[in-house]
Amino acid sequence: MGIFYGLGAALCWGLGDFAITTLARYVGSARSLLYIQVFSLVSWFVLIPLFPHEVDTGLSVWWIAALAGTFHVVGLATTYRAFEIGTLSFVSPIASSFAIVTALMFVVTNNSPETLSLAGIVLLVCGIVVVTRSTGSGGQATLKGVPEAIASAVSFGVMFWIMDVYVSGPLGDVAPLILLKLMASTFAAAYVAKSKYEPAPVMPPKGTLIGIALVAALLDTMAWVSYLIGYRFDHGAVVTALASLFSVVTIVLAGVFLKERLSRNQWAGVGVVLLGILLVSLPKSENAPVSAVAGPDVLAESK
């Protein structure tokens, strides 16, 4: 069952990232962020009964959760921007490497580093270097969005570390997610209200755009549900490892529908990044800290 939940989460997050990219390239990253987060927020209010948890009412933990929410907002904003302007096959695996940043945070805060985690961190850096120093075939690939993708990985990595260490225990899974999505929706609404709207030259009907936003939000929610249920039934290690590879789905879709073409060196760099993510997500020893892994909702989506 762990394989089922892990693959389900990876598939939904991967499809969701592609839907986010499609919407962002029509209406911009800010508006796509607003629409998707609002729809996702509504879905989590509906799902509260599925994940009951006695919530700590102390203000201190909520302030810490709000700090995590700030990193979440930055992570979402930079993810959506990277998807809007960048080559999806580049920026998706880089943005999805936040689990490596979370592992690095545990190392920095004096927890005993795991060999696999350290290897994953090294592979991530090497993969990014290979990608950014290579040239795409036919000039189709661009390095635009790579800085935003790196910023996304750092922001989500710190966010998940804060959630793992300070928030998930007293608040559970759903309450923090609702707070994070509420903060993201508020930020996006404020930004959209003050920014100038420049739609794409060719726009689909408004109903189609709403449909894309709904699908993206639904996929993000389904991915989270699959991940959380799998983790609840003690399949955490398997679910985490498989879910961490959601970027593979996005890369395949980018090649098929966006016709992105990468050079061999660039494919090698992407592969090294994905391998680093997998190494960090593999089962650890019992005394090692467990880092949270999810999507650019993630989580991403939720990203």
Give, region by region, the residue ranges found by the protein language model.
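C-terminal functional regions that serve as terminal interaction/effector modules
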Residues: 237-240, 246, 254, 263, ...
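Specific alpha-helical transmembrane segments that line the substrate/conduction pathway
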Residues: 9, 67-73, 80-128, 177-178, ...
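Hydrophobic transmembrane alpha-helices of multi-pass small-molecule transport proteins
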Residues: 39, 97, 101-105, 114-134, ...
